[in-house]
Amino acid sequence: MKKNAVVPFLVACVCYVLPLQAQIPDNHPIHLFQSYITGDFDNSRQIAQELQAGKQVHPYAKHVNRVANEKIDHLPNPLNGFFLLEESYYKYAEGDTIVKPYLFFFEALPEGKVKLYSMQLPKEIAPKDIRNDNPLLRFDYRTLQPSPTFRPAVYTQTERGFYLKAPNEFPGGVFTLEETIGKDRLEVMELLIREGRQITPYNMPIIYERINMTK
C-alpha cells in the first residue's frame, strides 16, 4: 500500500480457500504469466520523466518477485499454480522507504485464465524476515490461508499481457486493484476511495519495468 493510503477491511471476513490440486497443461497461459511477473522491476523511468516534467507524482517503487514454491513445506504435488513472494518497496521524495512483503498464489483456471489469491502472512514470522534472499524463510502449506480482506480475482489474457480489475468494498469505501502484467512491464494502479474521497494521491498506474533477469 502506498504512502497516505489506508489498508481497507471488508464488511464481512469471507473465508476463501485454495483450489483443489491438478496438473497444469504445458500450453496453459500461466507459464507465460509466470515468466512475465517473475523478476526485479522498478519505475525509475517513470520517475525520471515526471521530474523532467517538473513534478514527481508517483513514489519510487520496486518489486522483487520470485517463485516461492521451494520455501513452502508440505506443498501438494501436482500443484495447480505457483506461489510468488513479492517484496514491495515504495519511497516518496520526502519520506522514508516503506517495505511491504506479500505472498500470492496464482491458480491456472481451465479456460486459460489466471486467478490471484493474496495469502495471509504467518504472524509468527517478522515482516523483515519475509525476503526472497532469506535462506531460513519457510512457510507451511497446511496453515496458509487466503486473505479474508481481498476477494480472489482473475487475470484475462489480452494483446498487452494479462489484465485484472478487482474492486473490494469495505465500510465507507472501495479499494480497486487494476493491473496489466506484460513482457518486461507491470502496470499497477491501487485506487482507494473512502467516504467518496480519493485517498490514493495519483490517478495513473505505477509503470514498472524489468531491471534484471530472474535469478
Show where each model-derived region lies.
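Charged, amphipathic alpha-helical segments
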Residues: 26, 63-71, 168-175
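Bacterial Sec-dependent N-terminal signal peptides
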Residues: 1-25
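Residues in flexible loops and secondary-structure boundaries
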Residues: 8-9, 14, 49, 73, ...
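Calycin-type beta-barrel ligand-binding domains and close structural analogs
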Residues: 32-36, 44-54, 83-215
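N-terminal, post-signal-peptide region of Sec/Tat-exported proteins
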Residues: 46-79
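N-terminal helix-cap/turn-to-beta initiation motif at the start of protein domains
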Residues: 24-40
